[in-house]
Amino acid sequence: MYYRTRTYIAGDWDHDKDAVEALHRWNESSKYGLSFSDAHELKQAKDTSLNCSIKRSLAERLDASKTFILIVGDHTKELKAGGCQYCGSYNSYRGTCSRGHTIDTRSYIDFECEKAIRDGLKIIVLYKSTFVNRDKCPEVIRWKGIHVPMEKWIGNTLYLDYDSVRNAIGQ
């Protein structure tokens, strides 16, 4: 059992990793006032080959979190990774797991969002864009929490908007 003191960051790690890394840079820098304890610093899944093992590990991290941040980019809504149907242990003919685990066809993102809502975490949705486009957000969390863009134009240059992110997180 953990105390709920951490911040859980979810997103498309293949396409939006730069936004996640920006949050970590702002958190680690003495120049910025962002301050959070990352839930992903807790233990990792022992068997990362099984989606159910990874989801168990994600659930433990969410159990230690008070804030859930979802970074929404161009591909977030379409992510499918994490569903049992993509695991080698899934028997599509029978719709069962050959290892005896419960079947969960949700993606990692949908799993994380649903658990954050169910657990009553503070929800912050950061759009890797200059505007909020809820159509890009997973449906389960589309109308929950605080939604803000995390980019802004200054002149002809696109920047990450630290102030917008900090205000959303409430620090």
What is the predicted role of each segment?
Residues 1-67, 170-171:
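Conserved N-terminal substructure of TIR/SEFIR domains
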Residues 4-6, 127-171:
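C-terminal interaction surface of TIR/SEFIR-family domains
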Residues 11, 72, 125-127:
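Short beta-strand/turn micro-motifs composed of small residues
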Residues 15, 76, 131:
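Surface-exposed, flexible loop/turn segments at secondary-structure boundaries
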Residues 21-22, 83, 135-139:
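Short aromatic-enriched loop/helix-cap "lid" or pocket-rim segments at secondary-structure transitions
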Residues 30-57, 74-89, 94-103:
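Conserved BB-loop
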Residues 68-69, 123:
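Short, well-ordered beta-strand core segments
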Residues 79-134:
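Amphipathic helical hotspot of TIR/SEFIR-family domains
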